[in-house]
């Protein structure tokens, strides 16, 4: 089961107050519902491929309105042969939709979120939970990027949902997609805050555990890469220095060098793997800084280049 599916399963088991149940139902029906007429009656179908969400809608409708609700199961005939669950409401569909602030006067569908429905902070959370159950997805925290989104068919609802989410300082943004609109989060911290707001506390803990391990692994990898790069740089410089010192030895002999250069040349030949700092601690005159050692080695490089190019050699 994917992380998103586990999160939704957790949410469908939450107990909610009556006011919050209406807010959650409103989001679920507004985003996944469709209306039709049968025998001069309004028929509401709420469709989902998630059995737990279908049970949630069925239970909330029965609890809030004590009406007859049908739960139908259909088999998809296309590539994804998942079951499709339809929660069907025939009895009192119109007054229920009006109570949930979905249906307005003259059978006009309200595409914005009603302020009356989300006056309380708990109801705002519940509407967001319903919206996530209806059209939400979230990447597994182990994947390369953090991403949570909620799909809406209509721009008005999408913008309204984005404003609602940002009342919780989630920094959500909107984007137009091919068949609708999304409100999305890209920051890991904001995704965990959203999971907390909608009540997915177990999923939040799992997300944070994975994120901490992942971030720590990335930090270690960056550190190792940095150390490896520095080591490669040190080894490369050491090999170049040894090659130049051997050239000097072959052409004029190390004894021709001033004492300070001769000593550091011999130390570099004998200890090719050590750092400049370690070389500075080996000189006979006492500890010398990295910059001091580097200055002497650069002088040896200059002498080697002068010998290669046939120039007169300056040993000072």
Curated annotation (Swiss-Prot):
Stated family: Belongs to the WhiA family.
Annotated organism of origin: Bacillus licheniformis (strain ATCC 14580 / DSM 13 / JCM 2505 / CCUG 7422 / NBRC 12200 / NCIMB 9375 / NCTC 10341 / NRRL NRS-1264 / Gibson 46)
Keyword Cell cycle belongs to the record: yes
Annotated InterPro entries: Homing_endonucl, Sporu_reg_WhiA_N_dom, Sporulation_regulator_WhiA, Sporulation_regulator_WhiA_C, WhiA_LAGLIDADG_dom
Functional summary from the UniProt entry: Involved in cell division and chromosome segregation.
GO biological process, one term: cell division
Listed name of the protein: Probable cell division protein WhiA
Annotated NCBIfam families: DNA_bind_WhiA (TIGR00647)
Lineage: Bacteria, Bacillati, Bacillota, Bacilli, Bacillales
Record's keyword annotation contains rRNA processing: no
Origin superkingdom: Bacteria
HAMAP family given in the database record: HTH_type_WhiA
GO MF annotations, alphabetized: DNA binding
DNA-binding region(s) from the entry: 275-309
Alphabetical keyword list: Cell cycle, Cell division, DNA-binding
């Amino acid at each position: 089961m994917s992380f998103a599916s586990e999160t939704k399963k957790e949410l469908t088991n939450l107990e909610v107050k009556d006011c919050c149940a209406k807010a959650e139902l409103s989001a679920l029906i507004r985003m996944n519902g469709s209306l039709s007429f049968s025998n001069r009656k309004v028929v509401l179908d709420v469709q989902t491929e998630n059995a737990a969400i279908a049970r949630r809608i069925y239970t909330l409708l029965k609890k809030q309105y004590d009406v007859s609700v049908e739960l139908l199961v259909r088999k998809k005939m296309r590539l994804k042969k998942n079951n499709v669950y339809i929660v069907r409401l025939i009895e009192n569909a119109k007054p229920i939709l009006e109570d949930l602030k979905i249906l307005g006067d003259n059978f006009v569908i309200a595409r914005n979120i009603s302020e009356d429905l989300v006056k309380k902070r708990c109801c705002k959370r519940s509407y967001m939970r319903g919206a996530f159950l209806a059209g939400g997805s979230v990447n597994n925290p182990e994947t390369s990027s953090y991403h949570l989104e909620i799909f809406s068919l209509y721009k008005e609802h999408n913008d309204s949902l984005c404003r609602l989410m940002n009342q919780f300082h989630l920094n959500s943004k909107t984007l137009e997609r091919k068949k609708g609109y999304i409100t999305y989060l890209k920051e890991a911290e904001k995704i965990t805050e959203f999971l907390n707001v909608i009540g997915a506390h177990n999923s939040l803990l799992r997300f944070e555990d994975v994120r901490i391990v992942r971030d720590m692994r990335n930090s270690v990898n960056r550190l190792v890469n940095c150390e490896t790069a520095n080591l490669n740089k040190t080894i490369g410089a050491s090999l170049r220095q040894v090659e130049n010192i051997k050239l000097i030895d072959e052409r004029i002999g190390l004894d021709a060098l001033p004492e300070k250069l001769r000593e550091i040349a011999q130390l570099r030949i004998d200890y090719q793997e050590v750092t400049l700092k370690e070389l500075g601690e080996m000189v006979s005159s006492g500890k010398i800084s990295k910059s001091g050692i580097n200055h002497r080695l650069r002088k040896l490089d200059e002498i080697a280049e002068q010998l290669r190019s046939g120039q007169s050699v300056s040993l000072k």
